[in-house]
UniProtKB/Swiss-Prot annotation:
InterPro entries: aa-tRNA-synth_I_CS, aa-tRNA-synth_Ia, Leu-tRNA-ligase, Leu_tRNA-synth_edit, M/V/L/I-tRNA-synth_anticd-bd, Methionyl/Leucyl_tRNA_Synth, Rossmann-like_a/b/a_fold, tRNAsynth_Ia_anticodon-bd. GO terms for cellular component: cytosol. ATP binds at K625. The gene is leuS. PROSITE patterns: AA_TRNA_LIGASE_I (PS00178). Gene3D superfamilies: 2.20.28.290, 3.10.20.590, HUPs (3.40.50.620), Isoleucyl-tRNA Synthetase, Domain 1 (1.10.730.10), Valyl/Leucyl/Isoleucyl-tRNA synthetase, editing domain (3.90.740.10). A motif ('HIGH' region) lies at residues 50-60. It is found in: Cytoplasm. This is Leucine--tRNA ligase. Keywords: Aminoacyl-tRNA synthetase, ATP-binding, Cytoplasm, Ligase, Nucleotide-binding, Protein biosynthesis. One of its GO terms (biological process) is leucyl-tRNA aminoacylation.
Amino acid sequence: MDQTTHDASAYDFTAAEARWQAAWEARNCFATADAPQGGRRKCYVLEMFPYPSGKIHMGHVRNYAIGDVIARARRAQGYDVLHPMGWDAFGLPAENAARERNVDPAKWTRDNIAAMKADLKRVGLSVDWSREFATCDPEYYGHQQKLFLDLWRAGLAYRRESAVNWDPVDMTVLANEQVIDGRGWKSGAPVEKRKLRQWFFRITDFAADLLAGLDTLENWPERVRTMQRNWIGRSEGAEFTIRLAAPCGGIESVPVYSTRPDTLFGMSFVALAPDHPLATAVAAANPEAAAFIAECQSAGTSEAAIEAAEKRGFDTGLRVVHPFDPSRTHPVWIANFVLMDYGTGAIFGCPAHDQRDLDFARKYGLDVTVVVAPKDDPGLAVGDVAFTGDGVIVNSGFLDGLDVAAAKSRAIAELESRGAGKGVVNWRLRDWGVSRQRAWGCPIPMIHCEVCGTVPVPEKDLPVRLPDDLPFDRPGNALDHHPSWKHVACPQCGAAAQRETDTFDTFVDSSWYFARFCAPHAPVPADPAATSHWMPVDHYIGGIEHAILHLLYARFFTRAMHRLGQVGVAEPFAGLFTQGMLTHESYRTEDGKWLYPEEVIRHADHATTLDGRKVIVGPIEKMSKSKRNTVDPSAVIARFGADTARWFVLSDNPPERDVEWTEAGAQGAFRYVQRLYRLARSVAADRADDVALERAEGEARKLRQATHRTIAAVTEAIDGFAFNVAIARLYELANAIAETEGRDAPGLPAARREAMSALIRLAAPIIPHVAEEANAQVSPEAGLVVNQPWPVAEPELLKRDSVTLAVQIMGKLRGTIELPPGADAETAIAAAMAEPRIAQLLEGATIVKRIHVPDRIVNFVVRP
């Protein structure tokens, strides 16, 4: 449905939305002080800031509409509200654009920001745009460089050699996830393993705190907390050395970590990570081992890739001596499923009690010895399924007869007494490598001098700015190819030196931006007074895909800044809300070409292209550019208005669930927006009477009760992020108002005006433009809706004049009765028996029992 201009009663959303957005901006309605002094409660609402790709999508609309509803409602409820917006502006897409299209990444980014900002403004967000910044602003990344130096001086940032995935064509380091089947995700070139000196943040210093802090985050989804607990990965076990039967390359023993020292007597083999020092020593003398290691390294190095890959191994020919029984030796294998950066990079395999070890042992014909048996099956034999449950230790010498927990303690004590090992707590979490060989990022403010070593850039020289003329005409890091930027004098001795040419991982940029928003123009990274007032963020809103990395890094950064005395809180986000995705059918032609929804005509039982060709309709799935099943918000807003888009993305499902975009749903939302405006015009045209609201009876009182119940219900629903429930209640109130149109009852005009005023203010956080337009019809003297207080329900009107009780006979519903709330059993039973249909059904029967559930049920148990 396109906007109807010939109907004088229709809401002209195009003109109205522009008019009210201009009014809000002119009056600075959403500006907030850095540290307000009014003593009011604060509410910091923040949606994860976007990457400036150039166009917003409907997922953005849903994400920012959720935050906007909360921000607008809290502002109306009397809170000081901070609701800022910025741009996560560094990253690979801008650099790719520079290389592929010969455009300046800064200009490309700024142009995209301008386009997306205009789009977001059209959505009508209650954002304090005076706080806007982009992470590529030198002022912002200069403060980030200052933070880095603070962390470096505190020992929380350091540089060391690290194995990396190197793309020889793009000449850059790739994350594990960017290695696909051993090749670079972009270049397709075979990836090489190299060792480079990289910068790291010592996040492991905070592992215990980060884990314990999750228990305090009661307003986070449990799913996210569980994901972070697993990522941090605390485990208790034993770290011990296993002696090689014969040294290899100067190595005499292998350190091993295990959470199951109780199963040591079930050891069948030792497995090494492909990049373990002993594996390297074996490969130096064994070409077959070297080839196997190269295969492992090219097959994908992410945990997901390793987990999915077939479990393979290489027998080194080495053997180790069992730590408890020197008469036993076991083979040493190199295995593709062992990770060097977890534990010690070596494991002992106990196939009977670990499924992965069992699969490996069966594949290569290795021993399987049961050492834990169920209490009721001491002779357990393991087939193709490992026994991983609790039980009694068997076939284990001095551990026999103990339960698993006691055996763990006894095994650790024995290792300690022999000087071979000890009990330890291990963490899956590893220090965060933040070096990236990319030019379009925040420069790391360090200088390398052959005389002084690595030294910091003096703070007076911050920010270290990116050059304006980055050379993207050759592979590799453009900063390496910019001699006048790269070559500098050492700030300590004056000798010739070189800048650090690595830039920060963009996750660093988003790990503290929420603190900067509190006072974005302050001369320090995080202003103490402002962060003291606003932090933590009360409502942080974004996708579940950020559950681990971004959210964990932000928690680390906040704790590090707290340790340094820069912020007063240890946790950045008191509340976290992860919204669902927007979904849509996908469409393609018979030759496999994907189509946009606007290129398809849906018929009753099939679909065609605009020129009549057959279209294959695919499943409803996440909107994606690759499948073209996206809906352009700009087109939706032009056709239906921003309020329709906002209403629809919040109305169909709970916001934590996915929502399917449908034409019918958009049409329904559009009709409601139009209806609200028409209702306002109708109420504005009512003739007043002399009956005060407080004395309203009959139909007027009934409408007042509906109004105040809606106020209570919508308030509760918005507090609980149940926007679809709030919208359902708003539909009901609109229906209640419409049902009274044209009726002449005492007090009804005032009750209708009260109801309409409440409906406008309750709907305003969701559909703010039409709310302002409707308010101008009904209550122009009240001023902007955005400045009006939230309606408050009157307790007296929440009480029901009557309740409906179900009347049952033998548990089957036979009728209903209306009674005053709280009617006693005698009254309820008498009323039920007086109901003609019930009396007829009871006639001739003997009532054995009368059951009364107050305000709910009357039930008669009878016999003929």
